[in-house]
Amino acid sequence: MPTPSPSPRLGRRGFLALAGGTLLAAAGCAPQTTNAAHSEPAGELPTGPPPAGTSLAVAVRTSQIQLAASGLDKNLPFKVSSWINLNAGPDIIQGFRARSIDVASNAGIPPIQAEAIGVKARIVAVQERHHPTYTFATAPASSIRTAEDFKGKKIAFSQGQAQGVVVLRALKKAGLANSDVQLVALPSTQFLTALQSKQVDVAPLGEPTLTKYLTQYGKDGARGVPTDVVDLLTVLWAPLEVLNDPAKAAAVRSYVTLWAQGVAWAWDNSDQWIDAYYVKDQGVSAADGRRIVDSLAKPRFPANWDNAIAWEQETADLMAEGGFVPKLDVKTLFDRRFEGLAAAAVPAGFRAGA
């Protein structure tokens, strides 16, 4: 399959090529769909602690730091065999396929991507974010100031990650069709280089990457273009094979509660969180860390996943309309045996609707 090139409209083959690369090479001719009877977690969710010796490989860098800084890591009832410092959706999917990652955190789009290429995994926890988390950054000396100015411009577009859906939603809200712009297929790890070299005119960046970029290139005319586009979901998800292992499923159940408690701790102890994560891990100043944290909305964990499923369906439909993935009923992506566990683990003020 050829590497996708910049195009006004990237189709399903382009999406799958970008989503895969080495992933699709490993996938071979993996089927696009499978029989649902063989695709659902088996049995009731274990309620007790995981058996002694149970381990998980966890790809949630922020959680590693939150649990260590808060002391919650002492409550882990299983061994973390490795904390894997990966977060891009395609990398996580490759890790799932290679059986090197047991649980990870991403936005809502990677589970859709995984299903599209036959990698079976399920969502086990949901966090909602009712505030924009991405800002469109322009290349140096750009004239772009609003989303309407995107017409005719080159936009960095990673279809298999949250940033890709943010682009599609921003275009739709600005009254622009995908064909009104040039969608340049790039993984998000290449967005900064593409902006710096003016390979693209604009790219969606999250924090602290946005702050680092504007600190370096703001003097050259780079700027942030905010929109009100929300990327609602942060999810924990795990391969179906992991969830069908009773010992590992019990460990995932335990981790869901600690993950949520770590997120809540970071909100309630922002000075410690800024120092541990933004300053010591991400290399930004304490002042920039404070500005970033103050710009965020309070994390919320829904006890009921109906709203999350509706949002995920809207995302899947948007991707299907663009020809990037086959149509999908996203209800199959959620393992509702875990529904409400994260919400029950945090104070009432962190629950959706509070």
Model-derived segments and spans:
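N-terminal secretory signal peptides
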Residues: M1-L10, A17-A27
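Bacterial signal peptide processing site
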Residues: A30-Q32
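Short, glycine-/small- and polar/acidic-enriched structural segments
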Residues: N35-A177, Q182-A185, D201-E207, D228-V230
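Solvent-exposed, polar/charged alpha-helical surfaces in well-ordered, non-transmembrane soluble domains
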Residues: Q94, A98, I112, E148, ...
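Sec/Tat-exported extracytoplasmic proteins
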Residues: S100, S105, E115, K154, ...
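Pocket-lining segment of extracytoplasmic ligand-binding domains
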Residues: I109, Q190-D281
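Secondary-structure end/capping motifs
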Residues: D245-P326
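Conserved C-terminal helix/tail region of periplasmic/extracytoplasmic solute-binding proteins
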Residues: D317-A354
